[in-house]
Amino acid sequence: MESSLASPPCCTTAARPFDDRPEEDERLAALCKALGHPHRVRIVRFLLAQQACFAGEIAEQLPVAASTVSQHLRHLRDAGLIEGEVDGPRRCYAVNADAVATLRRLVGAL
């Protein structure tokens, strides 16, 4: 049975040019990968609500072992989403505002 609804063309290159931005695509993919676990998203949200927090305080917010939180923090730090400053035997974490602004801009441009 054929549909009487007209379907739009599948891909018309003249309709809208494709804006190829490989560097931005790579950065967005890296940031999304870093946020690819719900606990990491929660850590970033928690840090956005605070100015800075020690790793132990962050670990208290999640139902996982401190060592697991440490791994999540490393992923976020490696992607540049958070920064950690050593304070004696502890590390104090804060959100990298520039990286979050970049993430928001890149997601908004999708």
Name these PLM-found stretches:
Residues 42-45, 77, 104:
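A cross-family signal for key residues in well-ordered alpha-helices
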Residues 60, 77-78:
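Alpha-helical residues within the helix-turn-helix
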Residues 45, 71-74, 89:
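Base-recognition residues in the alpha-helical recognition helix of bacterial helix-turn-helix
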Residues 78-87, 94:
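Beta-hairpin "wing" of winged helix-turn-helix
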Residues 1-35, 81, 92, 101-102, ...:
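N-terminal leader segment of winged-helix/HTH proteins
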Residues 22, 26-65, 91-98:
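N-terminal helix-turn-helix DNA-binding core of bacterial DNA-binding proteins
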Residues 62, 106-110:
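Alpha-helical linker/hinge and terminal dimerization helices associated
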